[in-house]
UniProtKB/Swiss-Prot annotation:
Transmembrane segments: none annotated. It comes from Homo sapiens (Human). InterPro entries: KBRS, P-loop_NTPase, Small_GTP-bd, Small_GTPase. GO terms for molecular function: GTP binding; GTPase activating protein binding; GTPase activity. In contrast to other members of the Ras family, the members of the KappaB-Ras subfamily do not contain the conserved Gly and Gln residues in positions 13 and 65, which are replaced by Ala and Leu residues, respectively, and are therefore similar to the constitutively active forms of oncogenic forms of Ras. This suggests that members of this family are clearly different from other small GTPases proteins. This is NF-kappa-B inhibitor-interacting Ras-like protein 2. It is found in: Cytoplasm. Interacts with both NF-kappa-B inhibitor alpha (NFKBIA) and beta (NFKBIB) in vitro. However, it probably only interacts with NFKBIB in vivo. Interacts with GFOD1. One of its GO terms (biological process) is lung alveolus development. Keywords: Cytoplasm, GTP-binding, Nucleotide-binding. Its main location: cytoplasm.
């Protein structure tokens, strides 16, 4: 196990951010249970990557954003990844995710961060307000992975989080500027 990764989980209020984490990590979320508004919370989980290595991930569960509120500045420092959550039964929550992605892009200081997007409540088909094709098209144009999930089906949560942990902890690829002993010239600055 390497370093602990920091992941910020964010989205509009009442889209299921805390429920997703509770179900993923503990398997104990009861659908329909009373919702308690989150101020800010930290969850620590151990996720097996696609390489078979267990990695520790610290999830920063943020307060649901309302009425144009922005993500607090501290959410951008030293962050390795983001989970942006919207509810498939709320077009407004999807639009909030679009804005959050732009905010992250402006604030990440050229640092490589992994972003996954979750469309929660996909089991509520009759209440759907976000077209899955539109959402996938947006995700593709933004170069992020998007999954539709349901807290009621814990298995639907596994793939996105395995992907996230795997991507954040993958070994560094070879440098684009390999150091080679076969230099042209001597490298001397003497005339």
């Amino acid at each position: 196990m390497g370093k602990s990764c920091k992941v910020v989980v964010c989205g509009q209020a009442s889209v299921g951010k805390t429920s997703i984490l509770e179900q993923l990590l503990y398997g104990n979320h009861v659908v329909g249970s009373e919702m308690i508004e989150t101020q800010e919370d930290i969850y620590v989980g151990s996720i097996e990557t696609d390489r078979g290595v267990r990695e520790q991930v610290r999830f920063y569960d943020t307060r649901g954003l309302r009425d144009g509120a922005e993500l607090p500045r501290h959410c951008f420092s030293c962050t390795d990844g983001y989970v942006l959550v919207y509810s498939t039964d709320s077009r407004e929550s999807f639009q909030r995710v679009e804005l959050l992605k732009k905010e992250i892009d402006k604030s990440k200081d050229k640092k490589e961060v992994t972003i996954v997007v979750l469309g929660n409540k996909c089991d509520l088909q009759e209440q759907r307000r976000v077209d899955p094709d539109v959402a996938q098209h947006w995700a593709k144009s933004e170069k992020v992975k998007l999954w539709e999930v349901s807290v009621a089906d814990r298995r639907s949560l596994l793939e996105p989080f395995v992907y996230l942990a795997s991507k954040m902890t993958q070994p560094q690829s070879k440098s684009a500027f390999p150091l080679s002993r076969k230099n042209k010239g001597s490298g001397s600055l003497d005339g």
